[in-house]
């Protein structure tokens, strides 16, 4: 890890037209080779990517399941084989109305059953679904339960048959599939033409920077956040100097007997030292970011 950037979190504003992995790889000159992520975006999509650096890559599981918020544009009257602009487009010629779209949205809100796209990263018999799809195979993706907190119509243009929407959803929800299903509900077919992720948990794209800007300007500090921000939802415990050494060696310490689940253990500067599992008033380190 380059000097000045310990384990932490980087917020990328991914541009359209590149893969998430390509965007992340452009940061290695700034943050070092050990980089991880907390969920990718499709190449056509833009917006917030959470990138973990150094030992903080071990914190990905605390971020992957966070709720996400998107702005999206949906094209009605057509269908796409990939449910986005990168697939083969078939036009139905059928139109819809703003009222019909608004009336259909509640059916795709709350806990719903969703069939993810065939061109997705879901594993089917040990292989990514999109690999089978690209080979021309018929891909049957199983239905799964997802949570859509809100699906809001921002604007509908009757001439272009395009709708701008905002979606806040739980992890594992495909906005592409929401667009497809909305098109089916109004009887026109539909696919996603634009997608921008604006929030992941407590993190916002307004605090992110494009990867090339970070790399070219050596502006790493502007987009870097300490590892403690990745686990801001956990209980926190500040360590004494003696406890800091014990935890750094993987040893256990006493904590509040009423605590359950995991706890973030911090030093006197607020830096994250470890994540520990708590049982009966004892915290046992499971991830040590800063060894003694």
What are these regions (language model features)?
Residues 34-64, 131:
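Glycine/acidic-rich beta-strand-loop module
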Residues 62-116:
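Acidic, low-complexity central loop/insert segments
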Residues 128, 133, 162-206:
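Pseudouridine synthase
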Residues 26-32, 49-50, 138-172, 176-177, ...:
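The conserved catalytic core of RNA pseudouridine synthases
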Residues 33-38, 111-117:
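Active-site phosphate-binding and catalytic loops of NTP-dependent enzymes
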Residues 61-76, 139-153:
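Structural signature of FAD isoalloxazine-binding scaffolds in flavoprotein oxidoreductases
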Residues 120, 124-149:
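Extended alpha-helical targeting/anchoring segments
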């Amino acid at each position: 890890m380059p000097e000045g950037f310990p384990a932490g979190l980087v917020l990328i504003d991914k541009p359209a037209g590149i893969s998430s992995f390509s965007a992340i790889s452009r940061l290695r000159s700034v943050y070092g080779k050990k980089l991880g992520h907390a969920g990718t975006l499709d190449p056509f999509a833009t917006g917030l990517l959470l990138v973990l650096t150094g030992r903080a890559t071990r914190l990905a599981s605390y971020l992957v399941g966070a709720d996400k918020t998107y702005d999206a544009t949906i094209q009605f009257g057509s269908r796409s084989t990939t449910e986005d602009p990168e697939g083969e487009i078939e036009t139905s010629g059928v139109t819809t109305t703003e009222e019909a779209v608004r009336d259909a949205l509640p059916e795709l809100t709350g806990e719903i059953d969703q069939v993810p796209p065939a061109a997705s990263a879901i594993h089917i018999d040990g292989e990514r679904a999109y690999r089978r799809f690209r080979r021309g195979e018929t891909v049957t993706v199983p239905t799964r339960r997802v949570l859509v907190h809100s699906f809001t119509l921002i604007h509908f243009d009757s001439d272009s048959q395009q709708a701008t929407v905002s979606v806040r959803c739980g992890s594992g929800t495909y906005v592409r599939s929401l667009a497809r299903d909305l098109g089916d509900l109004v009887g026109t077919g539909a696919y996603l033409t634009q997608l921008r992720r604006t929030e992941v948990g407590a993190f916002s794209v307004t605090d992110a920077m494009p990867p090339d800007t970070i790399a070219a300007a050596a502006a790493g500090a502007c987009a870097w956040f300490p590892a403690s921000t990745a686990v801001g939802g956990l209980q926190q415990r500040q360590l004494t100097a003696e406890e800091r050494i014990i935890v750094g060696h993987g040893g256990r310490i006493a904590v509040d007997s009423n605590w359950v689940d995991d706890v973030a253990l911090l030093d006197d500067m607020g830096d994250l030292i470890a994540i520990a599992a708590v049982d009966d008033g004892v915290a046992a380190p499971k991830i040590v970011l800063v060894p003694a």
